[in-house]
Structure formats: structure tokens, C-alpha cells
Amino acid sequence: MWIPYDLRASLKGETDRETLRLSRADGQPRQFLVGFFLRNPVTQAWELDLAAEDGLPELPAVPAGASFSICPNEAGKLAEVIYRLPARSATEALELAHADLQPRLLAWLARVGRGMAIAGWRVADMTHRARWRSTPFRPSAMSLDFALAPVDRDLAPVVELFQRARNAPDPASRLLAAFAVLSAAVGHPAMAGSGAATLSITQDMLIHSGAIVLPDPLMGIALADLIALLRPEHDRLVGRDGVLLPVLDDLAGQKRLSLLANLADLVAHRLIQAELAARHRDAPAPAMAAGA
């Protein structure tokens, strides 16, 4: 099954192994380029509704010695921001550049009121000619019987929560929606056949969600334990009065949140599938046609 992996999870090498090895082995400060592809969350186009033009001068950034350039597409809209900065590794360069861009993006959003998001990024080590890229995973098409019966009315609200998780534009929204499905599986009558009481986290779940890399003791835990582990993340995003809290994670924090959201999302899907399978087993067989 496909999990909406968040692009914060990894950097994929684009050059040969030797250039990547040399870059990783070098701990000295040197010049890196970090490019951030930008996306309009409404149209899903990889551009922002901000007019830009070629040839604009580089602007100063943080840390000292860093700068960034504005890169338009053919339509004259901002499509990429490229940072030039000193760092000791590709990961450090990405984290430093992201830490500078994120509050800038918020300032632009607050000023013009248009949706803005980071679609992906690329990193280049100018000394060792090593390059990495991270962009959203594009899954292959899946087969489906389009004559499938609609979801039962009592189950539809739970599946709609799962729809929100799968369609979520960010890890926090995905975790909140998936967490609601997990909670429903424990006590909502529409999920009585989901097998929530016997579910446990498997290695397969951890691998497919990417959560296998987390230090938390996840293997083999029951659903109730998973909910307990996720609750602090949920509660720091939503206050006791149900209002979303202002939380701004760094890149490492966003990665952890993304992997936990992936796991919650995957488990939510497994529970809904189990509920649907139980209902199919319990459904009465269709009556034989008269005279057959």
C-alpha cells in the first residue's frame, strides 16, 4: 500500500557513490548550494503566486556568509529559492537553509495572504561535486473494482477522517486526522469489527511508514500503547480547549512528526480495511433468483 511519505524523510543521491562518499567523509566547512522547490497548495503547481524575474541580486541570509537567490519559472512566478552557504555536510546545509527559509516563507505568506509550501529540495556539495535530491514519491496506479458498494452510512464519518489524513497537506494535519481514526477504533461502534483489541505493530508497518528509524519502542506494541505514544504529539498540537496551538518545529522535529503521522495513517487504514472485511464476512448471501 502507498503511504504519503513526507519529503523530510531522506535525501536521495544523484551522483556516483564515490562523490557521495567523499562528501560524507569530509567534515570541513565548505560551500553548498541548497535549492527549495516551491508549491502552490491550492493549484498544486510548483510555483507561487509571487512575481519574480531573472537577474535579481543575491540577498543575505543566516548563518553568516549565507545568501539566497530568487528563481522564476517561464511564467515569471517564483518557483525556487537557492541558498549558497558554508556547512560541514549536506544534512547540515539543508537544516541551516531550511531554518532560514521557513520564517521567510511565513513572512511572505503573512504579507500577501497566498498559500505557500515547500515541494522538495536539492543539495549540492560544490567541493566534491556531490548532489542529492528529495521530492515527493509518485506511486503507480492501482487497480480497483469501480462497482464497489458505497461505504456504510455509520462507517462513513470514520473513513472521512482517514480521507482527511490521506489528503492532508502537512504531517501535523495528517497525524491529527489519523489519530482520530485510531481513537475511534477503540470505542466507536462503527469500528467494532476492526480487530483493534488484537492489533499490534509489526515490522512491516514500521518499514512501510518509515518509522523503523525512530528510537521509540514501537515493535509489537498494541493499539492502546500506540495511541498513548502518539498522544503527547497530538496534545502539543491541540490545546485542551480544542484550539490548534502555535507550534513551529525545526527540520528534525518535522521529520519525527512526519514518520509518526505515517505510522498512524498506515494503522488507521489497516483498521478500516479489517472493519470492511468483517462486514463483508457477516453480510447475508444474496438471495437466489426465483426459478434458478
UniProtKB/Swiss-Prot annotation:
Known pathway: One-carbon metabolism; methylamine degradation
Database matches in Pfam families: MauJ
Domain of life: Bacteria
UniProt name for this protein: Methylamine utilization protein MauJ
Annotated organism of origin: Paracoccus versutus
Encoding gene, per UniProt annotation: mauJ
